[in-house]
Amino acid sequence: MDYTTQMDAAKKNVTTKEMEVVAEKEQMEISELKMLMAEGKIVIPANKNHKSLSAEGVGQGLKTKINVNLGISKDCQNVDMEMKKVEIAIAMKAEAIMDLSSFGKTEEFRKKLINMSKAMIGTVPIYDAIGFYDKELKDITAEEMIGVVEKQAKEGVDFMTIHAGINRETAETFKRNKRAMNIVSRGGSLLYAWMELNNKENPFYEYYDKILDICEKYDVTISLGDACRPGCIDDSTDASQITELIKLGELTKRAWDRNVQVMVEGPGHMALNEIQSNMIIEKKLCHGAPFYVLGPIVTDIAPGYDHITSAIGGAVAAASGADFLCYVTPAEHLRLPNIEDMKEGIVASKIAAHAADIAKNVKGARDWDNKMAEARQKLDWKAMFDLSIDPEKAIRYRKESTPEDPDTCTMCGKMCSVRNMNKVMAGKDVNILRED
């Protein structure tokens, strides 16, 4: 192998098998794909040890991808349930799965996940450190934190959230600028607490070059975590968020100098009118690196419905330049999602991603909608179900309320506009009260 990472291969004009897979999926010329990868505007997260991976690209000109979060917590330790979620996420064509397990020894679960998943796998190494070393946060050493990164890289993790932007300088900006909700990033809050408790620099920032060594060796894509993402709409686009984003832009260039692929993570909670400008700011400050957003959630008043608040924000964000959406479920802010929550979150995120791809004029994005329009015009119900983003739900709704005329539905019956236009344009009579 005469290259170290996918980015290195692109810079050397070497075509990898992963590039071939992505180019075919995206209907993009290999030459264009390699050019954008060499510039850092597209990443293909593909750890050398993830053998079951079906590669996906994230970035400029590609379809918007979605990520599904899962994993065990101290209060919910049902590994079998989480593996069932993995199977469903893959069946529903999620392109990425993040193991956010935050309790105990997670290695066995993660290895099983990597072995079975054709979706790219992401993690947040700081979550694993406490359980792996069985130590309180303040007692974990910087070397041990870096050790977790290396351990997970060896296991085959494709991308890792590394909160390297929350350094002492960013922390001071945070202290000087009051927020309604402080730091809501789980990984970011842990690292901020570690810095304060130990009066030391963030290990992920101080030893960033060591992390780059690891990521280059295994071709792990760094997902630069936004520790200072807003946790409510009142905190969005503030000094802490932007200070960290500037730092993430600098860290992006350092990674590129080592041929390490980079994504940048973003908000968060944010009012609709701020989303587009935030996408522009990220692309500018982070030099066109792919943007991975959690939501954004556009209002804070909808517990139980945050898959909707997130889909609204995600559609606007992706239409304005975001490349990767982290799904949000109805259980957000309330509890660990169950399987039904997960399904709803995936569907909502996929709708947002697809709507954005239409707006961005991504190649082939409209084809799906055009086929649905054709099926509806023909009143071809089987085709409509087959084309539905959630066929199971569409079929169930149809069966729950059966119309007299099988061509129609119980909303309009024989007043169905499509039915009647088809008839009259074919020179036939339109009978509403009588049998045809």
UniProtKB/Swiss-Prot annotation:
- Keyword match Protein transport: no
Q: Name the keywords, alphabetized.
A: 4Fe-4S, Iron, Iron-sulfur, Lyase, Metal-binding, S-adenosyl-L-methionine, Thiamine biosynthesis, Zinc
GO MF entries? 4 iron, 4 sulfur cluster binding; carbon-carbon lyase activity; zinc ion binding
GO cellular component terms listed in the entry, alphabetical order: cytosol
Source organism superkingdom: Bacteria
Protein's job: Catalyzes the synthesis of the hydroxymethylpyrimidine phosphate (HMP-P) moiety of thiamine from aminoimidazole ribotide (AIR) in a radical S-adenosyl-L-methionine (SAM)-dependent reaction.
Q: What is this protein called?
A: Phosphomethylpyrimidine synthase
The organism's taxonomic lineage, starting at the top? Bacteria, Bacillati, Bacillota, Clostridia, Eubacteriales
